[in-house]
Amino acid sequence: MGKLLRKPLNERIAPGVTLVQDINQANSPLSYVGFRLIEMEKGAIYQEELTELECCIVALTGKITVSEGNDIFPEIGTRANVFEKIPTDSVFISGGRAFQVKADTEKARVALCYSPANQDLPTTLIKASDNSIEQRGKYQNKRLVHNILPDVSEVASSLLVVEVYTNGGNFSSYPPHKHDRDNLPAESLLEESYYHEINPEQGFIFQRVYTDERTLDETMAVEHQNAVIVPEGYHPVGVPDGYDSYYLNVMAGPNRVWKFHNDPDHEWILERD
């Protein structure tokens, strides 16, 4: 299956551009999902030509200018730190196009989320105000969700992107759920990646990835700027007291529908008053 936990690479790939995470088909068990995290210094430029993939560029922190053809989106981005817990701006770019990202602030952190380009779609600015915001769960199962590219959006052809905040002492992606069977309308097949940040940064969270048969069963202590790959199975997250969790999810599969199946052993928690 390969290693599911990915530590930061911190490789300089261009002047002022550091590659922190790089998940793709060649270095992972994933067939649909790709993910890159780059950190940029002011004035630095990152360029990429997409072929068969579409991409959502998320301005995690700082301000950036994104250019594709005649489309230029100047100084997008809304926060200096993800733990401001406000939505941010993103840009969707379809396959077969080239784009450029330029850092406009002293530092910028940018997520690049990839999946197969099944249609030729317009380059689109997804404003922070376009994000739908949800408060999910109760008891010690509360989380704040920013939907960047939900399955109801028609901006992308296969890509799903969401941000999730979980306070200390809470669980998220819980009760454990999975989406690894192409069995609609009961369940959809979606691979997933998690990019994690933790506040304060010296903290850690726990994430378990497991299947019903336990042919895959891996529990990880996940630190700041680690990534976790979820090719299949349930994938709950637990956050220790005193620390807050942020993660960015990228999902994709044969159908752009998020339909999950809860672990029946733990679904009872949803039935509480």
Swiss-Prot record:
Which SUPFAM superfamilies does the annotation name? RmlC-like cupins
Q: Does the keyword Isomerase apply?
A: yes
Q: What's the superkingdom here?
A: Bacteria
**Record's keyword terms, sorted:** Isomerase
Q: Name one GO molecular function term.
A: glucuronate isomerase activity
Matches recorded under Gene3D superfamilies: Jelly Rolls
The protein's name: 5-deoxy-glucuronate isomerase
GO biological process terms on file:
inositol catabolic process
Provide the function of this protein.
Answer: Involved in the isomerization of 5-deoxy-glucuronate (5DG) to 5-dehydro-2-deoxy-D-gluconate (DKG or 2-deoxy-5-keto-D-gluconate).
User: What lineage, starting at the top, does this entry show?
Assistant: Bacteria, Bacillati, Bacillota, Bacilli, Bacillales
Q: Provide the reaction this enzyme catalyses.
A: 5-deoxy-D-glucuronate = 5-dehydro-2-deoxy-D-gluconate
The keyword Membrane is assigned to this record: no
Extract the Pfam families matched here: KduI
Its pathway, per UniProt, is:
Polyol metabolism; myo-inositol degradation into acetyl-CoA; acetyl-CoA from myo-inositol: step 4/7
